[in-house]
UniProtKB/Swiss-Prot annotation:
Protein name as it appears in the record: Negative modulator of initiation of replication
Regions of compositional bias (Polar residues) in chain numbering: 43-54
Residue ranges that the Swiss-Prot or TrEMBL entry lists as coiled coil: none
Gene Ontology CC terms: cytoplasm
Annotated source species: Psychromonas ingrahamii (strain DSM 17664 / CCUG 51855 / 37)
Length: 207
């Protein structure tokens, strides 16, 4: 896969043609151009938010890299419309048909994190700073920091955790964790953000 730069209006056009949660730029373009589908293992979910003042994020060179994505020159996040299931908070997301029928745990995990971010951005950022493993951050805004390691063995292990952009946010999160670890991440985030206990308890049922 290759990194490319596209102008803001083209990027917004791609975003406007997302038909399914987690759909990648390649999948969207293949559909729009009526091209045959490629292997899903080579796809990276589309990222819909980039901080204009930040330098462009370089992709990590790895034969199974999951970090390469289409990067726009400028994107005004205020002009991005959230998919309907993500726009009304966690309680509404749990009850939405899209969430209930989603069979892939990682997709539910990402939907929850995106919804939590837009429900309270400041609280989400604070919670992200506190939600960590023993030696690793689980999520953050700086992919290079997430990939930082004291040894090559540690770095290779973390690359295998497949950090991915949380859709419609500037955050990345590890995704190649088991369901129990994903529940822990969501539970810690929700507790730090002050969600009511009954909603936090639903994580065990919903993921």
């Amino acid at each position: 896969m290759k990194n490319i730069e596209i102008e803001d209006d083209l990027y917004k056009y791609i975003l406007a043609n997302i038909e399914a949660f987690g759909e990648t730029p390649s999948q969207i373009l293949r559909r729009l151009l009526s091209l045959p589908n490629a292997s899903p293992d080579n796809a990276t979910p589309i990222t819909s938010s980039v901080t204009p003042s930040a330098p462009r994020q370089e992709a990590v060179n790895d034969e199974s890299s999951v970090f390469e994505a289409v990067t726009p020159k400028v994107l005004d996040r205020a002009n991005i419309s959230l998919p309907e299931p993500l726009a009304h908070g966690v309680n509404a997301l749990f009850d939405s048909e899209v969430f209930k029928t989603e069979a892939v745990v990682t997709n539910k995990f990402m939907m929850l994190l995106a919804t939590m971010y837009y429900e309270n951005k400041n609280a989400f950022e604070d919670a992200a700073d506190k939600t960590k493993g023993r030696t690793r951050d689980y999520l953050g805004q700086n992919l290079n920091a997430l990939l930082a390691a004291d040894s090559e063995e540690e770095q290779n292990f973390f690359k295998a955790s497949k950090p991915r952009n949380i859709p419609h946010t500037p955050f990345w999160v590890i995704t190649n964790a088991n369901t129990g670890r994903k529940r822990i991440i969501i539970t810690q985030m929700m507790a730090s953000m002050g969600y009511p206990h009954y909603l936090i308890e639903r994580i065990k049922e919903e993921i």
